[in-house]
């Protein structure tokens, strides 16, 4: 069943799964089902593993809810309580609509790149577990420099162009009859994102009203019923939620019209009809064919709507570029139309003129082609080249002569064992070479790999790699000449202290319990103390400068 730390958000009883009665539990991070009379879950799905949910159409005999997983599997739940089946199913559906977006998988390129790096490099994976999983440093700090190094790879560094918004994305919203003289719209997350990017006023209204004043279903129902969606209606209801959005769009359209399109290669004002007078000259009197007001023109509303829709679709891409590149502190307007006015600034104007009069094929290409160094497996470069030692090679004849000489000496050899070593000298030598003898004072350091178990050696290696990574971040902050480095060096000091408490001290206690020498970690402690002394010296000099 649910653990004591899990928060149960909703419990629905009389829910069947494969013709077996049970109860459905919605918790903070997963949905689970337990058979009736059992104290354990037989079905449990994390919200991050759920792709979408589906419900049975209205009028069906069975009130069901289906969960579709990312792996392609499905799970069906049948709400068997006749009196409250629809109400309970809708309650589960509405709660899942709020929970699933929070746990939506982020299957982007950056995450795939991180997974690939961890799978290909076991040392990096172990370092990730020692530092990030144990919460010594954050994941952002761990990946700060590593992703930048891999960005130089030609396969991953190419900037992928984002998919724009289709001009007919609303045409994909095909209403279906629900059998009760009503319409049902099926909205996907892509369509909702396109609506928000095209109409920032709707996104602002969504943030204001959902879920504070109404549910998401009510919001989109009122959106498709509103005058804002049906622009060809003549009158706007007084209680229309989107009346303000239409006014904001009208204001933005007037601003765009007043600014015009400042394209030096195209003059749109010259396309206006200019009738000739009787004397074959341009008449200054306005034509009677265009004397009708906009309100009298039945096509003006739909033309204005098309123009505004096209402008907003184009502006959505510009707003995304400014959000990625622009951190210049310029305020943006509420209606989101501020990006539309910057399309043809002088820099863009010069670029368009240069594009029209220059040809790349005729220009001189003076750029030097360089090849970026890409180390696929860095552990292959940890060891330097082995120096070549001068060796004297013997020929086959030299080897034969040496063998014959040794053979002749061995034939005439007579052993004299009593004159080799006396018994007292042999006894004193054995005593000096025994553990605790005069010649065995430094023997522990030479045989540490034989005295320490393999698991302790492996853990000690992991500690060295982890502390080396932390110290690399620490020493890279010097010289501390920016506010960012000042903040980072103080933060890295706290990370080193956290590593010492959570990793180094438990390891010392472990080897102490096994009656091993605590000198195993003396070098790590020395490196940490050197870093602390460096930070203390920098802080002292900083205080002296301030005083």
UniProtKB/Swiss-Prot annotation:
SUPFAM superfamilies per the UniProt record, alphabetical: BSD domain-like (SSF140383), PH domain-like (SSF50729)
SMART domains in UniProt: BSD (SM00751)
GO CC, one annotated term: transcription factor TFIIH holo complex
Disulfide-linked positions: none
Chain positions with N6-acetyllysine modification: 239
GO biological process terms on file: cellular response to leukemia inhibitory factor; nucleotide-excision repair; transcription by RNA polymerase II
Keywords: Acetylation, DNA damage, DNA repair, Nucleus, Phosphoprotein, Repeat, Transcription, Transcription regulation
Ranges of residues in domain BSD: 99-154, 179-231
Locations listed in the record: Nucleus
Residue numbers carrying Phosphoserine: 338, 356
Presence of keyword Chaperone: no
Region (Disordered): 319-342
Transcription recorded as keyword: yes
UniProt biased composition (Polar residues): 321-340
One Pfam family here: BSD
Principal localisation: nucleus
Subunit organization: Component of the 7-subunit TFIIH core complex composed of XPB/ERCC3, XPD/ERCC2, GTF2H1, GTF2H2, GTF2H3, GTF2H4 and GTF2H5, which is active in NER. The core complex associates with the 3-subunit CDK-activating kinase (CAK) module composed of CCNH/cyclin H, CDK7 and MNAT1 to form the 10-subunit holoenzyme (holo-TFIIH) active in transcription. Interacts with PUF60.
Function field: Component of the general transcription and DNA repair factor IIH (TFIIH) core complex, which is involved in general and transcription-coupled nucleotide excision repair (NER) of damaged DNA and, when complexed to CAK, in RNA transcription by RNA polymerase II. In NER, TFIIH acts by opening DNA around the lesion to allow the excision of the damaged oligonucleotide and its replacement by a new DNA fragment. In transcription, TFIIH has an essential role in transcription initiation.
Family: Belongs to the TFB1 family.
PANTHER family in alphabetical order: TRANSCRIPTION INITIATION FACTOR IIH-RELATED
Full protein name: General transcription factor IIH subunit 1
Organism whose genome encodes this protein: Mus musculus
Taxonomic placement: Eukaryota, Metazoa, Chordata, Craniata, Vertebrata
Gene from which this protein is expressed: Gtf2h1
């Amino acid at each position: 069943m649910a653990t004591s730390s899990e928060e149960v958000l909703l419990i629905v009883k009389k829910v069947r799964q494969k013709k077996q009665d049970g109860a459905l539990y919605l918790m903070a991070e997963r949905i689970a089902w337990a058979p009736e009379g059992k104290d354990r879950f037989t079905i449990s799905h994390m919200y991050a593993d759920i792709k979408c949910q589906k419900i049975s159409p209205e009028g069906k005999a069975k009130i069901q809810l289906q969960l579709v997983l990312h792996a392609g599997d499905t799970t069906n739940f049948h709400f068997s309580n006749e009196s409250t089946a629809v109400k309970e199913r809708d309650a589960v559906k509405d709660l899942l609509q709020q929970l699933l977006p929070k746990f939506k998988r982020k299957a982007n390129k950056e995450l795939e790149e991180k997974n690939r790096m961890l799978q290909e490099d076991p040392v990096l994976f172990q370092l990730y577990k020692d530092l990030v999983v144990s919460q010594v440093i954050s994941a952002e700090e761990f990946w700060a420099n590593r992703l930048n190094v891999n960005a130089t790879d030609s396969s991953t560094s190419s900037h992928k162009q984002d998919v724009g918004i289709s001009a007919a994305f609303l045409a994909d919203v095909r209403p279906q009859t629900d059998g009760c003289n009503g319409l049902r719209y099926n909205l996907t997350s892509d369509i909702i994102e396109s609506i928000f990017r095209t109409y920032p006023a709707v996104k602002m209204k969504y943030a204001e009203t959902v879920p504070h004043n109404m549910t998401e279903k009510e919001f989109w129902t009122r959106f498709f019923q509103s005058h804002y969606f049906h622009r060809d209606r003549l009158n706007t209801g007084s209680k229309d939620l989107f009346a303000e959005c239409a006014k904001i769009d009208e204001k933005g359209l007037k601003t765009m019209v007043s600014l015009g399109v400042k394209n030096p290669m195209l003059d749109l004002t010259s396309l206006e009809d200019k009738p000739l007078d009787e004397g074959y000259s341009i008449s200054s009197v306005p034509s009677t064919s265009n004397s009708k007001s906009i309100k009298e023109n039945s096509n003006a509303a739909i033309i204005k709507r098309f123009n505004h829709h096209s402008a907003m679709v184009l502006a959505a891409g510009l707003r995304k570029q400014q959000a990625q590149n622009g951190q210049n502190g310029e305020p943006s307007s509420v209606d989101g139309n501020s990006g539309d006015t910057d399309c043809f600034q002088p820099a863009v104007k010069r670029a368009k003129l240069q594009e029209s009069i220059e040809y790349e094929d005729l220009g001189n290409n003076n750029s030097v082609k360089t090849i970026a160094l890409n180390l696929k497996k860095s552990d292959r470069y940890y060891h330097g080249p082995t120096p070549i030692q001068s060796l004297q090679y013997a020929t086959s004849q030299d080897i034969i002569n040496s063998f014959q000489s040794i053979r002749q000496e061995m034939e005439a050899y007579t052993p004299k064992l009593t004159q080799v070593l006396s018994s007292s000298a042999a006894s004193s030598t054995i005593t000096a070479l025994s553990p605790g003898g005069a010649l065995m004072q430094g023997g522990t350091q030479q045989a540490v790999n034989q005295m320490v178990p393999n698991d302790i050696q492996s853990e000690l290696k992991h500690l060295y790699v982890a502390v080396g990574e932390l110290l690399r971040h620490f020493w890279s902050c010097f010289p501390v000449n920016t506010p960012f480095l000042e903040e980072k060096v103080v933060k890295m000091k706290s990370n080193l202290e956290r590593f010492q408490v959570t990793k180094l001290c438990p390891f010392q206690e472990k080897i102490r319990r096994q009656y091993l020498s605590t000198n195993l970690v003396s070098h790590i402690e020395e490196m940490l103390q050197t870093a602390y002394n460096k930070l203390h010296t920098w802080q002292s000099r900083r205080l002296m400068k301030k005083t």
